[in-house]
Amino acid sequence: MEILDTVGAVICAAGSGLAPADKKLYALRDTTSTVECIPLIASSIMSKKIAEGTDSLVLDVKVGTGAFMKTQERARELARTLVGLGEQAGVRTTALLTEMSVPLGRAVGNAVEVEEAVQVLAGGGPDDVVELTVALAREMLAASGVQEDPAEALADGRAMDVWRRMIRDQG
């Protein structure tokens, strides 16, 4: 939390103990052929997000041939359900529907995707990655009451400065 407070960003992963019942519920969904049940999908996702204790949440709901939600209608239903669950739990929640019928960016694989993200932070990178990054950041800043333009932070180097401080401080 100290790095988050001083730098304003941190990379972390939730442990399996965050929402321990989720794994069992997924196995039950698999056994009962309800893996595609939107209320259960949303409950699984939001149980972990709410358990994190966040005040605001921006969700990127993918739609298209490369996504779990193949149609706009199902993606909208999932987004509405996710936002509703978040709001009921007292978490300011918004969701963007983003296309996933073609790959995002030009990289495939963790290491090269991180490299591509660093290119975006440095003011470059593929246009579609920049567009999505700015849209998600704009939503998160608005949800947090911050009146900043993330595109400006990319252009003037502030985003890269925060990245470097975060990497340095996290070791």
What name fits each language-model region?
Residues L40, M46-K70, R76, E87:
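Phosphate-binding glycine-rich loops and their immediate beta-loop-alpha structural context
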Residues L85, R92-G171:
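A glycine- and small/hydrophobic-rich beta-loop-beta segment
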Residues C37-I41, I50-A51, K70, R74, ...:
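Short, contiguous, pocket-lining structural segments
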Residues M1-E52:
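Phosphate/pyrophosphate-binding betaalpha-module
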Residues D22-T31, D60-M69, M100-P103:
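Active-site-proximal beta-alpha loop/turn segments in soluble metabolic enzymes
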Residues M1-V10, R80-G86, G90:
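A glycine-rich helix N-cap at a beta->alpha junction
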Residues L4, C12-A14, D60-G64, L96-L97:
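Short beta-strand segments
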Residues A75-A79, V114:
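Amphipathic alpha-helical segments in well-structured domains
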